[in-house]
C-alpha cells in the first residue's frame, strides 16, 4: 500500500503518531527464509510435485510446487480454511523468498482444483513416498500408538457420513485413523475414513501398509491402543506372525463376562495395599466369547471414596474403579505393574490430534470432493512433520515444541527485504535474547545442512540420504548412508 493510500493520526500514551502505508517489502514472517532453505535442501515438495499423478497440459497452469508451497504457508500462519491464504497473497516478500513463478501466491481454489480430479487411491499413492520419510525417524524398539478422531463437517462433502460424533450428534463427519510413534509426536501413517466406522475399522489393512516397510518391521516392537482395538481379528493378526510381528497391548472393554471374571478373583490375589486411593492389580488368563485362544489380561483396581466431599461421607464407603488390559507380552518381558505403566504412556499420542486440530487446522480444511479433503489432511500432516523436525534441529532439544509456541519463536519475526546490488538481504527486527537465540539456532541449521546431502529421494524402494534421527541399533542395510550415522545424537534426543 502506497503512502498516499493510508494516512492517519493516533494519540497513544507515547504521544501523537502518524500511521502511513509503505511500498517496501515488509513481512511478518521473517522465519520463512530459514524454513524455505530447509525445504529446498530436503527436496520433499519438489519430489512431491514431480510425482503428481495427472498430466498438466495448460501452459498457464500454476506449477504444482507453487500450489504445495502456498498451502503449506497457509498452514504455518495459522490458516484453517483454504480462503485464509488471502492474507499472504499481497505479501511480496513471501513470494520473492519462496521463488514463486508468478511472483504471487496462488488463490484459494488452486489446491482444491489440483486434487479434485484424483481418486482416493491416487491420493494415497501420491503421498505414500513422503510418508515413508517419517519411517526413518522411528527409534529402535518403537511403540506404535493407534488412535482415531472425529472431524465434524458442515455442508455437503463426499465421504462425510453420520456416525459416532460426541460433540455434534447426528452431524456428518470424517473419522481418520492414525498411527503415532510413541514419544515422538510423529505420525507414521494415516487412513482417511468415513465417520460410519469404529476405531478398529480397516486397522488390519492400515497395519499391513505400515508393515510393508522394512524399517517398520525392524523397529516396531509393540502396537498399543484403547478399547476400540482390543478385538479378536486385531489380536489374532499379531499372534499369527509366529514371533515376527510386534506384540500388542490394548485396553479391554469391561463386558459382562470380564466383570464376572473380575468378581471371581479372591481378595487375597490382588497385589498392592487395599487402602483408599491406591492402585491394586491382578493377572488373569481369560478366553472370552469369540476369542480364538486364552490371553493374558491385567486388571487394575482403584478404591475411590463414594462421596469425596470436604465434609466426608456418612458411611465411609468406597467404590471400586476397574480397568482391564489385554496383551501378549510375557511375564518375562513385563510384569503386571509394568504393563499398566506402559499403557498409560500412550496418553501423549492423543496430544497429536489435539495439536493438529487446534493449532494446524486439521479439522478445518475441507472440500466438497473427498479427494480434496483427504489431500489437504495428508498435506497438512506432512507440513506438521517437516515443521516439527525443523524445530528440533534449530532448538536442539529432546522434547516436542507445539506450533503455538514454536511459530512465535521461529516464524513470526518482523522482517524487511532489501535489494542491494545483486544481493537479497532480509533484515529481521530482533534484538537482545531473541537475536542470540536465532543466531544459535541458524548456526545449528547451517551446520546440519552442511553435513547433509542436498538431494532427497522419496521413492518407495530407496532410503532418503538425509536422516534426522539415525538408529543406534540398525541392520547393516540401514546404515549405508553417511548422514545416517553422523546424526545419531539427534535420534537419541527425540526420546527425551
What do these predicted ranges mean?
Residues 1-171, 176-197, 201-216, 415-496:
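Dynamic "connector" segments at or just before major functional cores
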Residues 155, 231-237, 259-263:
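A short acidic (Asp/Glu
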Amino acid at each position: 500500500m502506497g503512502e498516499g493510500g493510508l494516512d492517519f493520526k493516533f494519540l497513544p500514551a507515547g504521544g501523537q503518531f502518524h500511521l502511513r502505508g509503505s511500498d517496501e517489502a515488509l513481512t511478518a514472517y521473517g522465519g520463512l527464509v530459514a524454513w524455505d532453505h530447509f525445504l529446498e535442501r530436503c527436496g520433499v515438495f519438489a519430489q512431491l510435485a514431480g510425482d503428481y499423478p495427472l498430466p498438466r497440459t495448460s501452459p498457464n497452469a500454476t506449477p504444482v510446487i507453487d500450489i504445495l508451497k502456498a498451502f503449506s504457508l497457509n498452514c504455518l500462519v495459522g490458516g484453517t480454511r483454504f480462503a485464509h491464504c488471502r492474507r499472504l497473497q499481497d505479501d511480496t516478500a513471501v513470494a520473492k523468498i519462496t521463488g514463486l513463478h508468478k511472483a504471487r501466491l496462488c488463490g484459494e481454489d488452486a489446491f482444491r482444483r489440483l486434487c479434485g480430479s484424483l481418486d482416493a487411491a491416487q491420493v494415497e499413492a501420491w503421498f505414500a513416498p513422503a510418508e515413508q520419510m517419517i519411517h526413518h525417524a522411528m527409534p529402535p524398539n518403537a511403540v506404535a500408538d493407534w488412535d482415531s478422531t472425529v472431524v465434524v463437517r458442515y455442508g455437503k462433502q463426499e465421504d462425510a457420513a453420520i456416525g459416532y460424533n460426541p460433540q455434534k450428534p447426528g452431524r456428518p463427519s470424517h473419522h481418520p485413523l492414525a498411527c503415532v510413534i510413541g514419544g515422538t509426536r510423529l505420525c507414521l501413517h494415516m487412513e482417511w475414513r468415513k465417520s460410519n466406522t469404529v476405531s478398529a475399522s480397516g486397522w488390519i489393512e492400515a497395519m499391513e501398509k505400515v508393515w510393508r516397510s522394512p524399517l517398520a518391521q525392524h523397529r516396531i516392537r509393540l502396537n498399543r491402543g484403547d478399547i476400540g482395538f482390543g478385538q479378536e481379528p486385531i489380536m489374532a493378526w499379531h499372534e499369527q506372525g509366529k514371533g515376527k510381528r510386534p506384540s500388542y497391548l490394548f485396553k479391554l472393554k469391561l463386558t459382562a463376562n470380564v466383570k464376572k471374571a473380575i468378581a471371581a478373583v479372591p481378595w487375597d490375589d490382588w497385589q498392592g495395599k487395599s487402602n483408599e486411593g491406591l492402585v491394586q492389580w491382578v493377572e488373569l488368563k481369560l478366553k472370552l466369547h469369540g476369542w480364538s485362544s486364552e490371553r493374558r489380561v491385567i486388571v487394575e483396581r482403584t478404591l475411590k471414596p463414594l462421596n469425596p466431599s470436604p465434609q466426608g461421607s456418612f458411611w465411609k464407603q468406597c467404590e471400586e474403579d476397574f480397568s482391564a488390559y489385554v496383551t501378549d507380552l510375557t511375564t518375562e518381558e513385563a510384569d503386571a505393574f509394568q504393563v499398566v505403566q506402559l499403557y498409560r504412556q500412550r496418553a501423549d499420542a492423543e496430544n497429536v490430534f489435539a495439536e493438529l486440530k487446534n493449532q494446524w487446522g486439521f479439522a478445518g480444511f475441507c472440500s466438497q470432493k473427498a479427494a480434496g479433503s483427504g489431500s489437504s489432511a495428508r498435506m497438512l500432516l506432512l507440513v506438521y512433520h517437516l515443521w516439527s523436525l525443523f524445530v528440533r534441529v534449530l532448538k536442539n532439544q529432546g522434547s516436542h515444541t507445539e506450533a503455538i509456541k514454536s511459530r512465535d519463536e521461529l516464524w513470526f519475526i518482523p522482517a524487511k527485504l532489501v535489494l542491494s546490488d545483486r544481493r537479497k538481504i532480509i533484515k529481521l527486527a530482533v534484538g537482545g535474547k531473541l537475536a542470540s537465540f536465532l543466531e544459535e539456532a541458524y548456526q545449528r541449521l547451517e551446520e546440519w545442512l552442511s553435513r547433509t546431502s542436498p538431494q532427497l529421494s522419496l521413492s518407495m524402494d530407496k532410503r532418503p540420504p538425509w536422516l534426522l534421527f539415525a538408529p543406534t541399533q540398525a541392520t547393516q542395510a540401514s546404515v549405508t548412508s553417511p548422514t545416517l550415522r553422523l546424526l545419531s545424537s539427534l535420534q537419541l534426543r527425540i526420546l527425551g
